[in-house]
């Protein structure tokens, strides 16, 4: 065991060294260097504090993040590295970073102006186009710098664009940004904020096949521009997770009101919001667009000055209005007054609130509907004595309007203070409207008063046709006239409205709106004629125009019996708010009683800012946007609920009148939005012209009930949702007549007046039948809202270019504001939850990627090790074989050498013996010759001896030489034979060794090929498993997102159910009070009708009263049952809707899961195909490798054979020469032998 393993087991040595980061200081307390001086907010991953450097006093935003481990610290290093590496005037700078006690402190440059979205919410309006241009230009510069440095921001939105006090912007929050290593590198992470996500980023939720690049930021920039133009991004009403499907499948979003914006702006958005990534412009291209050719940041400096201005708030309650209502409710009921028959429920305020129609009006009205307008006009003309004084009042008011407006225009350049009119000046005389320097008063309701009187004339004419006594008619006229005088005094309170004049035309339009609304039967031709004249107004509005708040106050004359009845038939306070500049006109949505004659005062407060006289005239509507919210869901506001119980007759008449009023209202509000007050050095005066409205004409009702188009306009001043261009009421509610309610009453209401002669009970039931249909649908909500409502007045004072400017805005604080704030808070919570989820997913993805990369590295290392091991094994075997062969050859050679030596010695010994024998034989031959010579004669003996010796010597020498040569040849032959045998043996051994070596090499290559194939299989299995792991994690993350989405949906549904339960509880609690008040009113009206038509005896009257009381009790019981049934239906419908939403959500989730599974199957199939192709290519390359190897083996065998053949032929080619071995053993020559 090595020492390191030993140390690991016993945990010896130091702990793992902490990783050091370049820009993060460790083990230093940041509070030693920075002082916390305040809290800026609570971010998604920690709190953000305002800090100041103790040495340099530099301010910073300190983001403190609690990190539980070093691994979590890694998640924030990308953000810190990006902040540290960026040096651009439009990107926040990193000032310091600490890691201390498991807290990561990131201190970045402090931007005192705050985020763009926070500024819009503070000012309660979007940015103007000039402001958007500056923000867009500087943001583009920052993005271009980031993209040039290979950085994708991935979370661009208004909340991450910060203002400085100098009017510049800085891009912040790089928490989910990506820093690439290559310019063309792409990303496939599903990360960012849903509303601003590009479609290609959304697609990465289920498919990683099409990664995205830097152009994803360009899409987010386009969405951010829409957000700055409309306060909220597109699809903001959707759940953060459900919006993803909308982005992926729908067309690119556009501006809600395109006509308000320049063509350059719209073209710029089109270039940004291009779903085709290749066609989408880059930041460098967008910088050349004419929309961003701006240099001055003055619009932003003005915006910041206003946002950071000193604000004084004043909260005003509506107590005075309640007192007026109580006074009105305490007035005596004229004999000629009675509950109206709901002639129309068009969207006018007077039609919704006034309910003082003449008695018997419904029947006579029905009779007269079939008549022509000429007859109606003639009846109106016949009533001149009744209308003289109101007409004079109208003329009087018009004169005062002109005076007040002219005086206002001459003094408009002075700073104007807003003075609350009704609280300080109670009941001034109608003939003496005050014209003061501090309070310009404009009577915008005088025309409406005249029209109201016309309606009253018509209704009184109808009364005269149905009454039988001239005395009773005179009494009614007298009471009517007295009531009008009282009403005129009341109207004086409400029409004396203090107006810091926006323009004379604005007041005119408001008057026109009221006049149109008061004329129930106004024909379309008259309306169009009036609109044609009114459309000639200017189209600029001063920036910083303060809010105008119109409130509707009225009480039904039929409800003036007691204070309890004051809550009966007040229409709903569903507000129609149209913002012109910063102008709000609150109008109830739908009213239950529309045919009455009571004038509805409109309280209109316009507060004018002090504006530099030499200021550019073209500063227009840009600083205060026109906003119109159009709700398309019926029943979402209390005012809309009224339509559920309205009668068929109401629908029939309303279908015409509402259409007329809609057109008039739409066009006039549009005109009002274009009005401007231009203040230049010449102080031009604007002439005043208020037109009288044409006389009232009643439109004959259609024979069939028609759908009613009622514009449901609701402004949310905080959110600015569903903005529409003012005047273009493109979205309306289609309200169909309720066919299932009281078919008998429908027949009665659509009759021709014959019911007037039958009985007073039936008559009164017919008249009052409409009243019961609207009580349970929130008819007193306006009054309750008025009691609860408060007006919040904000005054901002700031200095722009050395000029002090004061902007005063008024806003009615209602429950909807708190609900909007609550919804915004909940939406922020949902986005924060999503951000946490994305951070966890990113961390899990990084961990998985690291794990998979480690697995790949490990398997590739193992492959390499196995290959090296296998090669080493066979190389070792071959080496051993070669070593063994070498040793064998050496041993054989040694053996052969020894054998050759021994054989040569043996042969030499034998030859020496034979030579010795041969020499002995020659000696003996010599002796024989001597003996022969001795036998010869003595004299011849000497000579013969000599001759015979010479002959013998020559003969013996030749024989000996031949014998020795023969012996040498025999020796060489024997040795050569031995050598040949040795060579053959060596050749065999070498051939065998070569064969063995080649077999080993074949085995080595086969093993390598097998190993390669196995590695390919294992690599494929690993990649397949990794792909499954990746998709498993994607499915897991998708399911977690779906769980979170389902949880949010359930919370949302639960909120809806709770709201409905609370509303129904309030309605149930209100109903008994409404019924008691209504019962008193109806009983009083019934008794009065009995007194007027007193032809029966007192007993009969008492019986009728009892019968009426029984019918009333029955009717109230039916009302309670109808309300109960309605509540059950509402709850059932809501539950069904919630269930449908959940089903739809689950369906979308299942589609996403199915899509993910499809992608996984497709990727696995592609992986298998890639593996098959790779294996096929490998096998195709394997054949040439085998062939090459065999050819190499054959060549080596051939070379070996040639070598040994040549060696065999080269040895002993000349037998006469001594062999290589025998020459070392020389044969003794003749000289060595003695004689």
Curated annotation (Swiss-Prot):
Keyword terms: Apoptosis, ATP-binding, Coiled coil, Cytoplasm, Kinase, Nucleotide-binding, Phosphoprotein, Serine/threonine-protein kinase, Transferase
Any Gene Ontology CC annotation: extracellular exosome
Coiled coil regions in record: 826-1069, 1109-1183
Keyword Chaperone among UniProt keywords: no
UniProt family annotation: Belongs to the protein kinase superfamily. STE Ser/Thr protein kinase family. STE20 subfamily.
InterPro entries: Kinase-like_dom_sf, PKK, Prot_kinase_dom, Protein_kinase_ATP_BS, Ser/Thr_kinase_AS, STE20_Ser/Thr_Kinases, UVR_dom
Gene: SLK
UniProt biased composition (Basic and acidic residues): 421-432, 522-539, 679-695
Binding site residues for ATP: 40-48, 63
Enzyme category, top tier: transferase
Enzyme Commission designation: 2.7.11.1
Modified residues (Phosphothreonine): 183, 569, 814, 1097
Annotated protein name in UniProt: STE20-like serine/threonine-protein kinase
């Amino acid at each position: 065991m090595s020492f390191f393993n030993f140390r690991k087991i016993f945990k010896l040595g130091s702990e793992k060294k902490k990783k050091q980061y370049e820009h993060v200081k460790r083990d230093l307390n940041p509070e030693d260097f920075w002082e916390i001086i305040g809290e800026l907010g609570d971010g998604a991953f920690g709190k953000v504090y305002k800090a100041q450097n103790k040495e340099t006093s530099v301010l910073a935003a300190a983001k403190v993040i609690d990190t539980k481990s070093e691994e979590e610290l890694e998640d924030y290093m990308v953000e810190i590295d990006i902040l540290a590496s960026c040096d651009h005037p439009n990107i926040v700078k990193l000032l310091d970073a600490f890691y201390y006690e498991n807290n990561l402190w990131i201190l970045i440059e402090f931007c005192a102006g705050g985020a763009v979205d926070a500024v819009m919410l503070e000012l309660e309006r979007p940015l103007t186009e000039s402001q958007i241009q500056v923000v867009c230009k500087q943001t583009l510069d920052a993005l271009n710098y980031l993209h040039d440095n290979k950085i994708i921001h991935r979370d661009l939105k208004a909340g991450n664009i910060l203002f400085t006090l100098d009017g510049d912007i800085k891009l912040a929050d790089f928490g989910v940004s990506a820093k690439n290593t290559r310019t063309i590198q792409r990303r496939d992470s599903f990360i960012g904020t849903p509303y601003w996500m590009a479609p290609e980023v959304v697609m990465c939720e289920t498919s990683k096949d099409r990664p995205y690049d830097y152009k994803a930021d360009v899409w987010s920039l386009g969405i951010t521009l829409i957000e700055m133009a409309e306060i909220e991004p597109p699809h903001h009403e959707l759940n953060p997770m459900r919006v993803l499907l909308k982005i992926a499948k729908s067309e690119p979003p556009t501006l809600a009101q395109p006509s308000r914006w320049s063509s350059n702006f719209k073209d710029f958005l089109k270039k940004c919001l291009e779903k085709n990534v290749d066609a989408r412009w880059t930041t460098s291209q967008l910088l050349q667009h004419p929309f961003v050719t701006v240099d001055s940041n003055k619009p932003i400096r003005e915006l910041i000055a206003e946002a950071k201005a000193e604000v004084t708030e004043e909260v005003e309650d509506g107590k005075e209005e309640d007192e007026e209502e109580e006074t009105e409710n305490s007035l005596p009921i004229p004999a000629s007054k009675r509950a109206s028959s709901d002639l129309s429920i068009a969207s006018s305020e007077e039609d919704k609130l006034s309910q003082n129609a003449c008695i018997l009006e419904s029947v006579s009205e029905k009779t007269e509907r079939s008549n022509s307008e000429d007859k109606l006009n003639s009846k109106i003309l016949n009533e001149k004595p009744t209308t003289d004084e109101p007409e004079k009042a109208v003329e009087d008011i018009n004169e005062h309007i002109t005076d007040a407006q002219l005086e206002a225009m001459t003094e408009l350049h002075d700073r104007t203070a807003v003075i609350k009119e009704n609280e300080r000046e109670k009941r001034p005389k109608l003939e003496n409207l005050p014209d003061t320097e501090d309070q310009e008063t404009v009577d915008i309701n005088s025309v409406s008063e005249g029209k109201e009187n016309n309606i009253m004339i018509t209704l009184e004419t109808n009364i005269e046709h149905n009454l039988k006594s001239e005395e009773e008619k005179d009494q009614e006229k007298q009471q009517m006239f007295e009531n009008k005088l009282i009403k005129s005094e009341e109207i004086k309170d409400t029409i004396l409205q203090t107006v810091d004049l926006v323009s004379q035309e604005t007041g005119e339009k408001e008057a026109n709106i009221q006049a149109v609304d008061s004329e129930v039967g106004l024909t379309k031709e008259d309306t169009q004629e009036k609109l044609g004249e009114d459309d000639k107004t200017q189209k600029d509005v001063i920036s910083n125009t303060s809010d105008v708040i119109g409130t509707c106050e009225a009480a039904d004359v039929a409800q003036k019996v007691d204070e309890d009845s004051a809550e009966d038939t007040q229409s709903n306070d569903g507000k129609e708010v149209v913002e012109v500049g910063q102008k709000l006109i609150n109008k109830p949505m739908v009213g239950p009683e529309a045919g009455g004659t009571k004038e509805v005062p409109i309280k209109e407060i316009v507060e004018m800012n002090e504006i530099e006289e030499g200021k550019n005239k073209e500063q227009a509507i840009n600083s205060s946007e026109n906003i119109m919210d159009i709700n398309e869901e019926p029943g979402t506001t209390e005012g809309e609920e009224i339509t559920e119980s309205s009668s068929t007759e109401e629908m029939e008449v309303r279908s015409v009148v509402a259409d007329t009023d809609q057109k008039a209202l739409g066009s006039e509000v549009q005109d009002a939005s274009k009005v401007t007050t231009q203040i230049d050095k010449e102080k031009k005066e604007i002439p005043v012209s208020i037109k009288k409205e044409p006389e009232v004409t009643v439109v004959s009702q259609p024979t069939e009930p028609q759908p009613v188009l009622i514009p449901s306009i609701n402004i949310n001043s905080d959110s600015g949702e569903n903005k529409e261009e003012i005047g273009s009421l493109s979205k309306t509610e289609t309200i169909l007549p309720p066919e299932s309610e009281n078919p008998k009453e429908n027949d009665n209401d659509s009759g021709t007046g014959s019911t007037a002669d039958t009985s007073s009970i039936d008559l009164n039931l017919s008249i009052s039948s409409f009243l019961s249909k609207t009580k349970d649908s929130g008819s007193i909500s306006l009054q309750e809202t008025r009691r609860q409502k408060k007006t919040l007045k904000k005054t901002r004072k700031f200095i722009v270019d050395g000029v002090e400017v004061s902007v005063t805005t008024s806003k009615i604080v209602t429950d909807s504001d708190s609900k909007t704030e609550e919804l915004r808070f909940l939406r922020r919570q949902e986005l924060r939850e999503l951000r946490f989820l994305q951070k966890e997913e990113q961390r899990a993805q990084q961990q998985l990627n690291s794990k998979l990369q480690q697995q790949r590295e490990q398997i590739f290392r193992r492959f390499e090790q196995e290959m090296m091991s296998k090669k080493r094994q066979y190389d070792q075997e071959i080496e051993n074989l070669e070593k063994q062969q070498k040793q064998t050859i050496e041993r054989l050679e040694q053996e052969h050498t020894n054998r050759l030596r021994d054989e040569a010695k043996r042969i030499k010994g034998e030859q020496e013996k034979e030579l010795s024998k041969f020499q002995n034989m020659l000696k003996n031959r010599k002796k024989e010759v001597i003996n022969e010579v001795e036998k010869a004669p003595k004299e011849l003996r000497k000579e013969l001896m000599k001759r015979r010796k010479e002959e013998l010597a020559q003969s013996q020498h030749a024989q000996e030489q031949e014998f020795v040569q023969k012996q040498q040849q025999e020796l060489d032959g024997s040795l050569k034979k031995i050598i040949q045998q040795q060579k053959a043996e060596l050749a065999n051994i070498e051939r065998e060794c070569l064969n063995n070596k080649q077999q080993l090499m074949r085995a080595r290559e086969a093993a390598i090929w097998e190993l390669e194939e196995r590695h390919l299989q294992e690599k494929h299995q690993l990649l397949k498993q990794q792909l499954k792991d990746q998709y498993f994690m994607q499915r897991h993350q998708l399911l977690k997102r779906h769980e979170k989405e389902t949880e949010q949906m359930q919370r949302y549904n639960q909120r809806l159910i709770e709201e409905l339960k609370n509303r129904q509880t309030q309605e149930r609690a209100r109903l008994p009070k409404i019924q008691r008040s209504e019962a008193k009113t109806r009983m009083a009206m019934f008794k009065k009708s009995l007194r007027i038509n007193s032809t029966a005896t007192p007993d009969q009257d008492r019986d009728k009263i009892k019968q009426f009381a029984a019918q009333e009790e029955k009717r109230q019981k039916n009302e309670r049952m109808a309300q109960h049934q309605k509540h059950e239906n509402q709850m059932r419908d809501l539950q069904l809707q919630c269930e449908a939403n959940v089903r739809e959500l689950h369906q979308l989730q299942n589609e996403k899961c199915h899509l993910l599974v499809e992608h996984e199957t497709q990727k696995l199939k592609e992986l298998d195909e890639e593996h098959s192709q790779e294996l096929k290519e490998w096998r195709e390359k394997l054949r040439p490798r085998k062939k090459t190897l065999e050819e190499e083996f054959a060549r080596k065998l051939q070379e070996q054979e040639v070598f040994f053949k040549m060696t065999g032929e080269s040895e002993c080619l000349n037998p006469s020469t001594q062999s290589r071995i025998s020459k070392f053993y020389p044969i003794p020559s003749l000289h060595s032998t003695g004689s």
